[in-house]
Amino acid sequence: TVYIDDAVHPWRGERWAHLLADTLPELHAMAQQLGIPRRAFQNRRSGAHYDVPAALRDTAIALGAVAISVQAL
């Protein structure tokens, strides 16, 4: 399952969401569908994820990502 949180993280004048998944193959596949380059992948201790511009959040959900709150992370 792929998840996307509510886009509330401001950075460089935009709002960003975190795209995460149960498995790395799922995560990378969704990022590719969204046109996000692999170099944007962040393998952090807090969790592997991609930062997604808020403008792509609805597209991610339409492609099957499950919307979650920041608190659910």
Task: Set out the residue ranges of the language-model regions.
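The feature represents the first ordered module of a protein
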Residues: 1-27
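Terminal leader/tail segments of proteins
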Residues: 2, 12, 16, 33, ...
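Generic structural "secondary-structure junction" signal
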Residues: 6, 21-22, 43, 52-54, ...
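Short, compact, well-ordered microdomains
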Residues: 47-73
